[in-house]
A protein has these predicted regions:
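Secretory/extracellular carbohydrate-interaction modules
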Residues: 83-183, 334-345
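Activation corresponds to long, low-complexity, non-globular regions
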Residues: 81-101, 107-116, 261, 267-346
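Short, aromatic/His-centered strand-loop micro-motif at the edge of beta-sheets
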Residues: 186-208
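Bacterial N-terminal signal peptides
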Residues: 8-15
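Positively charged n-region of N-terminal signal peptides that target proteins for export
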Residues: 1-4
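Glycine/tyrosine- and acidic-biased, solvent-exposed loop/turn segments at the edges of beta-strands
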Residues: 20-86, 151
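Short beta-strand segments enriched in hydrophobic/aromatic residues
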Residues: 61, 108-112, 215-217, 236
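Carbohydrate-binding surfaces in secreted/extracellular proteins
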Residues: 203-243
């Protein structure tokens, strides 16, 4: 199983150098992740070419400040402008086994006020599978959708919601695959492959929220297969209220939750100067299936290549701690299409 996890991440393939590697062309060097220390007391973490700051990285100064951007031959060229969507950090984790699911829940702690201007998607259920159908969901600072879906297409004007809960699944465009909550909206589209989604207003900010996937007793026939609706609910601990994001249909009447799961924190919609991002902290913890705590024997943090490492994540005893908006100088392992750091492996 451990080998399967590593193979899934796809991070070791391509990292093995041939026995007799050719000398690198100095005119077109390949950037490698690393760190540098300079006589003025500053340090650097990021891409390095020919022993110099060259590529995307962060320079740290003795007074505690830093600058993140593009470098060439030890010179700072420009601030890094992140093009959306940007998964600032992902957390690939494995449950100890598959589960027959009635409920799947977790607690999200937002430890700072998050500004409306930051289009942030927090997805504690960043990728899960029920009976082989992928789903994802969480909360967003800016969200919206449409009143209805007709023949697989969105109908009517776009309705902005502001802060909201969002729940999506892949593999269909059918209107019967979704049920809006009261006051909610929906979407059916193909820009991320075929998917349907339900959304509803949730005035969230600093606080604690329990997010739960709930298997309902409602079923529907889709493509000659009986499906069961699953509702996403959010309990606001401060308001002591439960809010519904809506429901999506999944094939079968007995729902099996896959071992493999994922969390992501994504900036979407707007380009941002990373040096001007707010510093934010979050905790994802207390993952439970059918009300019972689950073991999490494997965790790896994932970072997109071609972006700076501008988030940090740790894991200990069922608790994921995430920081955004601050450069992460911890060493990462370079993989194929992504960089990663092992956080837990049993």
């Amino acid at each position: 199983m451990k080998k399967q996890w590593i193979l899934w991440i796809g991070l070791l393939i391509g990292m093995i150098s041939p026995l007799h590697a050719q000398e690198e062309n100095p005119m077109e060097p390949t950037p490698k992740l690393g760190t540098l220390t300079f006589e003025d007391g500053s340090t650097y973490s990021g891409e390095i070419e020919l022993g110099q700051m060259s590529g995307i990285g962060t320079q740290y100064f003795p007074d505690g400040t830093w600058r993140t951007g593009h470098f060439q031959d030890n010179k700072y060229l420009a601030d890094f402008i992140a093009k959306p969507p940007w998964h600032m950090v992902g957390l690939d984790f494995m449950l100890d086994r598959e589960y027959i699911m009635e409920t799947f829940s977790m607690d999200l702690k937002v430890l700072n006020d998050v500004p409306d201007s930051l289009q942030l998607y927090i997805a504690p259920f960043g990728t899960s599978e029920l009976n082989g159908t992928q789903l994802y969901g969480g909360i967003q600072t800016q969200c919206g959708g449409y009143y209805s879906v007709i023949k697989g297409e969105n109908s009517g004007r776009f309705i902005p919601l502001g802060r909201a809960v969002i729940f999506s699944r892949w593999g269909t465009r059918a209107s019967l695959a979704l049920k809006k909550a009261e006051g909610g909206v929906c979407e059916s589209s193909g820009y991320e492959d075929d998917f349907v989604s339900v959304r509803n207003t949730l005035k969230w900010n600093k606080g604690t929220y329990t997010i739960t996937l709930v298997k309902t007793k409602e079923t529907v026939m889709l493509d000659s297969v009986l499906h069961t609706y699953v509702e996403m609910q959010v309990y606001d601990h401060k308001k002591k209220q439960t809010f519904s994001g809506g429901s999506l249909a999944f094939p079968g009447t007995t729902l099996t939750l896959n071992q493999r799961n994922y969390i992501f924190f994504e900036l979407y919609g707007k380009r941002v100067n990373v040096n001007k991002l707010p510093h934010l902290k979050f905790v994802c913890e207390n993952y439970r299936v059918n009300g019972n705590p689950v073991e999490i024997p494997f965790v790896a943090s994932i970072y997109e290549k071609n972006y700076p490492s501008y988030a940090d994540a740790t894991y200990n005893e069922g608790k994921f701690k995430i920081e955004l908006g601050k450069p992460n100088g911890k060493p990462l392992t370079e993989g194929d299409g992504m960089n990663y750091r092992m956080l837990n492996e049993k």
